A protein has these predicted regions:
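Glycan-processing catalytic domains of CAZymes
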Residues: 1-258
């Protein structure tokens, strides 16, 4: 019987000052049974330097000190148009951080703007293979096409973001019809990012439903329109989700409640 712990997915696109990452650091430290997958993105990727600036190094070391935080480096593939060599260079820079600066831990790569065209399965899979070949430890690879994609994409990915949109779009016939094509084993490798949620109540309701009914382990539901600032209800959101973190999501033999 397949089991998977749910997690909160955090695009941490906030510059690290002394306090700007504290909402995440405090949540992870207070409740070590909660799991977070966190994307860091210094310069639309790692940037040209061998290491990010001192503030990033300090922030990354703080993240690395938390065993319940998985740190992913951001790269983008421009929907399949970016040259493979450029992607590989970004990946090598992230892998180099852990060598050049003790205390930094990069656990994998987040591939943004991943293509949804099934003809490009091999393109993204080659990137995933390069990640795993480059990192010394087993690496997590997350694709972000933002929509449901062909099953073949799941073969090389650990997780795929199947929805990144306004929360109001989640109940739409288009989304739900595509979601119904994903069986339990694919849902267990899926992530939902729902932004611009209209209220705190709707935020918490959707968060619960993603875990309880849809059996999707990874999520971020926020009232913010983007990821450059914290949701004002961040603490109540993760506190509500916390009650699910002590329960494994059992996916084998369950219905998804679409």
């Amino acid at each position: 019987m397949a089991e998977l712990k749910p997690f909160i997915f955090v695009p941490l696109y906030i510059y690290p000052t002394e306090t700007s990452w504290q909402p995440l650091l405090a949540a992870a430290a207070k409740h070590p049974q909660l799991f977070f997958k966190v994307v860091v993105n210094p310069k639309n990727g790692p940037g040209p330097e061998a290491l990010p600036d001192a503030n990033y190094v300090t922030g990354l070391r703080a993240l690395a000190s938390l065993a319940n935080v998985c740190v992913l480096g951001y790269i983008h593939c421009s929907w399949g148009e970016r040259d493979q060599a450029e992607l590989e260079n970004d990946i090598m820079v992230y892998a180099g951080w852990t060598v050049r600066s003790p205390g930094i831990r990069i656990d994998g790569i987040f591939i943004d703007e991943s293509p949804a065209n099934a003809a490009l399965v091999g393109y993204v899979a080659a990137t995933a293979r390069f990640v795993r070949k480059t990192f010394a430890n087993p690496a997590t690879v997350v694709y972000n096409p933002g929509v449901v994609v062909h099953v073949a994409f799941y073969q090389a990915a650990d997780f795929i973001v199947i929805f990144e949109n306004r929360a109001s779009e989640w109940p739409s016939d288009f989304v739900q019809s595509n979601l119904s094509k994903l069986g339990p084993e694919l849902r267990r490798k899926s992530i939902v990012i729902a932004h611009s949620c209209a209220s705190q109540g709707l935020q918490l309701k959707l968060g619960r439903r993603l875990f309880q009914e849809y059996r999707i382990p990874g999520q971020l539901v926020t009232t913010q329109a983007g990821y450059a600032s914290w949701c004002p209800y961040w603490e109540s959101y993760w506190d509500e989700m916390r009650r699910w973190y002590n329960r494994s999501i059992t996916l084998e033999g369950t219905s998804a409640g679409v």
